[in-house]
Amino acid sequence: MELDLDGGRLVVFVGGLLLFLFIESLFPARNWQGNRARRLFFHGSVAAFNTVLVRVFIYVPFLLWVVFVEQQGWGISRWLGLDGWLEIVLSLIALDAFDYFWHRANHRVPFLWRFHKAHHADNEMDVSTALRFHPGELVLSSLAKASWVLVWGPTPIAWFVFEGMISLCAQFHHSNIDLPD
């Protein structure tokens, strides 16, 4: 694959995190009650552990899976003959729809909620909350997404764009930024 999707994904993730941390420090919606440095260290540690887990055991095999599915011509998008911008846009819609229903399932299915509630256990929400996930949730989520990749069949670039967008959206949604009325 010509594009360095893995490196690009990391740049988008870290760049978004730093941007929202900076904006939060300038325009906080709520004053901090606890020690922010300690909180950022904790969430950063969770993220570091999860990054190793995800990168080694999930992300690389997953990206290879996306490439394999595309090469085999599997998935609805392949069967419809989608390509170019149309494939990317429709893949974003399809993957986002899956992500929405997966997130709803994490709140409604007791087994999934056991893992997802670690994310909701945060007492003060800020951009670092977007880093707080139970490793079990990451594994289960990746398995669910792998099945959806098989069904839909996005191209690797569509997958990369989706992962970047969902990461930036999650960081924004969790940010402690005072937005104007």
Predicted features by range, described:
Residues E2-D6, Q33-A37, S77-G84, A118-H119:
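Helix-boundary and loop/linker segments of multi-pass membrane transporters
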Residues I23-L40:
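Membrane-interface helix-loop junction between the first two transmembrane segments
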Residues V66-W79:
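Membrane-interface helix termini and inter-helical loops of multi-pass transporters
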